[in-house]
Amino acid sequence: MSICMHVTGKGDERVDYIPGISSIRLVDLPSSIVLRNHKILHRILEAFSWVTKTQYLLFNSIYELESQAIDVLKAELPMSIYTIGPTIPYFNLGENSSIISNHNDLNYLEWLDCQPRNSVLYISMGSFLSVSNAQMDEIAIGLRDSEVRFMWVARDETCRLKEVCGNMGLVVPWCDQLKVLSHSSIGGFWTHCGWSSTQEGMLCSVPLLTFPIAVDQMQNSKLIVEDWKIGWRVKQDVRGESLVTREEIARLIHKFMNLESDDVKETRRRANELQQICQRAIAKKGSSETNINAFIKDLSKCDGR
């Protein structure tokens, strides 16, 4: 908890002395604001209480992507540590992944089938945290003004956002996100940077627009933009109260979805590289499969004793 920061006026300052973590802005570190939420604080303290009883620590991550941090943890912590990610439902993605397995998938997958390749921006900001209504309106109007095709998972605000966003895309209450991200028409992913969404975007080789809200999402955004270089930030001051305006959003989306842009081409190239790293990790004899087998072997030894 000592790394939680109060960063008013100093958010762009950087620190480079945290073991295993490359230079990072203060604003991207965990905030003390998180600890004011009693439910979150209880979960954090509960997790800390388990450390002394723990024999194994499994990370839903890929060693090659966070090797420096993992190596530091292995050196500092007494338990065995294994990276076994990405732990998502299925790995063989491709054109067959758009096959409909649920009647509720029909409308949005049929719509995606009719869109040009890499032309649709997929938007999802998670279900746990939310942005203000004012910011949501700015995003919707900016999206409309960008004239970019989109698919937005908005849950409780579907009807209202449909009216604001115009007719360039779909607003739906739910979707099978992995199916959508692996669809050939998807060219970008506006994400809150939850860890599962981040991994799914990487595995599907989709460039990311990062819009973190709280908890670990700022650090995930930093990894996406600065370390892995597979995405762009929507909001520079992630803890500031000022809105990202509709004009800023429209310009950014239009630029991000321009497949002829050199910056976009480079981001897409990096996304392809990260996808290959993910695929190698979960392939036979890859790092994640090797770690899973090693963990099972260790458990078997314990049972034998």
Task: Spell out what each predicted region is.
Residues 1-179, 188, 204, 213-215, ...:
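Nucleotide-sugar-dependent glycosyltransferase catalytic domains
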Residues 169-170, 184-197, 206:
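Acidic donor-binding loop of glycosyltransferase active sites
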Residues 197, 208-210, 214-215:
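Short glycine/proline-centered loop/turn elements that form peptide/ligand docking sites
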